[in-house]
C-alpha cells in the first residue's frame, strides 16, 4: 500500500512527511523545496493483539509502545502542484508520474491563508482555492489518460464487442485501476456504455472525475491550524467540502516526535497529550506548552489520525496477524508479523499473502480469539489472528 502526499508548494507537505516518518528531508519556507519525491515509512496505529493474552508483540517491522502496535505503510511526498500541472506547468508532469502508483491521496492544505496558490507569502488567501485547484488538476490528469486514443479505442471496442471495463482498465493499468473499479463507476454513475465513442466532453470529464474519486480516495489534512486564522478557516472550509477533513499541526507533531526520540518527553503518536521526563530550558518549556494548548483544542496534532483514517476508513483495510496457538515464531518472537489486507479479503487470500504454497495447500484456519475453525471463504476482520492449517 502506498499513500501519496499532495498539495501546492509550501503548504507543509514535507513537514507532515517528516513528522510521520522521521526521515531526513528538506523543509523550507519557499516553493518547490521538494523536487524529487521523498519516500519513507509511516505507521498506522492499532491495538497490539498480544496484549489481549498478557503478552507484548515483537514486530519484525514497525514497533510496539504501551499496548499500541505501529504497522508500516509506504508514504510518498511529491513535488508541489500548481494550477496547470496537468498541462506541464511547474513540476506538473513529474508530479503526476510520481502519483500513478499511490492508492490514496493525503491532500495537505495550508489553513493559515498566509501563502497563495504558488506558495508565496500573502495575507487572507482563500484556502478553498487550494482544494478546488488540486481536485481539478487530478481530474484533468485522469481525463488526459482517458482521452489518449479514446475514439479509436472505443470504436474498436464497439466493432469487436469487447468489454468497456476491460478496455478502460487497460488504458489505466499504470494507475492501478481494475475492471471491477470501472464497472463500479459505470453502474454508480448510471453511464450508457453502448456507444462511448460518441460521449460528449462533459460526459468524459464526469467519468474521469468519478473514476479518480473512486480509485484514489482523498482526505484533507487541514494543516497549520495553530496559525492565527487556521482554526477559523478550518471550520469554514470543512463545511464547504465533502472530503473527510482532519485538523493538523504537523509542525507540532514533528517537534513532539523529535523530543520523544531525544528522551525529553514521552509521546505516543496519536495521543492528545505527552509527559515531560527530561530537563527543559525556558524556550523548550514554552514551546511545548504552546503545542499542548493546540493539542487540547484539536484533541491531538491530527497526523496519526489522518494516516489511520486513510488506511482503515477510506481504503477499508484490515490488520490481521499470522498466529499459531503459542503466538510465537521459531525464535520465540511474539506475533512478529502483521499484514494490512484489502476489504473483503478471505482466509484463503491471507494464506496466499503468506506464501503461495500455504495458499495452495490451505485446509482451514483457526481463529486465535475464538479457537474456532473457519473455511477458505471466511472474510477476515480487523485484528483477527489466524493460524493457517495446510495439508
Task: List each model region and its residues.
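Short acidic beta-strand-loop surface patches of small beta-rich interaction domains
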Residues: 363-379
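Canonical P-loop GTPase G-domain recognition
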Residues: 145-148, 152-155, 160-162, 176, ...
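Short, contiguous acidic and Ser/Thr-rich linear segments
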Residues: 331-346
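Short amphipathic, charge-patterned alpha-helical segments
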Residues: 344-358
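Loop/turn positions that initiate beta-strands
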Residues: 383-384
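Conserved G1/Walker A P-loop phosphate-binding module
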Residues: 1-159, 166-174, 213, 217
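Short, surface-exposed secondary-structure boundary micro-motifs
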Residues: 110, 389-391
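Non-catalytic, charge-rich alpha-helical accessory subdomains
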Residues: 158-236, 324
